[in-house]
A protein has these predicted regions:
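A conserved beta-strand element that flanks and buttresses the S-adenosyl-L-methionine
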Residues: 133
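Class I (Rossmann-like) S-adenosyl-L-methionine-dependent methyltransferase catalytic domain
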Residues: 2-123, 141-148, 162-229
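A short glycine-rich, Lys/Arg-flanked "PGG" loop and its adjoining helix->strand segment in the class I
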Residues: 147-159
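Short catalytic micro-motifs in class I SAM-dependent methyltransferases
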Residues: 136-140
Length: 229
């Protein structure tokens, strides 16, 4: 079946260093290493934070109508989308840079619109979605490129932006499996708000790690809303 997307026209953009990195063998290895069925996915979060991902999602979007149109940017194999389906959401889209992950997602997720593409150039009309979200994606975007991908997320959202990312009060680079320049943590909600004054922070929750090996680290979920003009 061929899916038709409500596209906007744009000129092709040059890939960033991070996009090329994740589109290659390293990204494929990440996909194989981190793909889990729903029960294992929830157990993974339970072991890190003492909360399942479904519980975390419900805290932020539990009241969102289940027919809401939702886009996940950087969906990988679609584990988050499966979680949203389990919550009753039915109008779901995912976009993923890495072709291998897209193939896996189309096998793993049923009834979801999955396409290959870049978060820097989302092929959707302005305000098309009720919610645009990321899950551990902004951490892999170079700090100087964050305004560009965030701008696309804001453009495509008619109301809400949600993120789940690593957190630090200031931008901090992290060595990632021996590689430099591919992982950062910061206050991503603050970066959104600094670049888009038309947003307001609805909710933010810091989740400290409960396992001994990661004590002192914490991740964040946040929900932003477009302020009516």
């Amino acid at each position: 079946m061929t899916l038709c997307y409500p596209a906007k026209y744009s000129l092709p953009l040059q890939h960033t260093q991070q996009e090329d990195f994740w589109a290659g063998d390293f990204g494929r290895e990440y996909t194989d290493r981190n793909s889990r069925p729903l029960d294992e996915w929830n157990a993974f979060y339970q072991g890190i934070y003492g909360h399942t991902k479904l519980e975390m999602n419900a805290e932020f979007i539990g009241d969102l109508p289940r027919e809401a149109r939702v886009l996940e940017v950087g969906c990988n194999t679609g584990m988050q989308l499966v979680g949203l389906q389990a919550m009753g959401f039915s109008n779901l889209y995912g976009i993923e840079l890495q072709g291998y992950a897209v193939e896996k997602a189309r096998e793993f997720v049923r009834g979801v619109n999955i396409l290959q593409g870049s978060g820097f150039d989302l092929p959707f009309k302005d305000n098309y979605f009720d919610l645009v979200c990321t899950n551990g994606v902004l951490i892999h975007i170079a700090p100087e490129d964050l305004p560009r991908i965030m701008g696309e997320m804001v453009r495509c959202s008619g109301r809400y932006i949600m993120g789940y990312e690593y957190y630090a009060p200031d931008t901090t680079a992290i060595n990632y499996r021996g590689n430099e320049g591919f992982l950062w943590k910061t206050d991503f909600a603050r970066v959104f708000l600094e670049n888009h004054p038309g947003l307001r922070l609805v909710k933010q929750h810091l989740y400290p790690y409960i396992n001994d090996a990661e004590q002192g680290n914490q991740d964040v979920m946040f929900l932003l809303e477009k302020v009516p003009a």
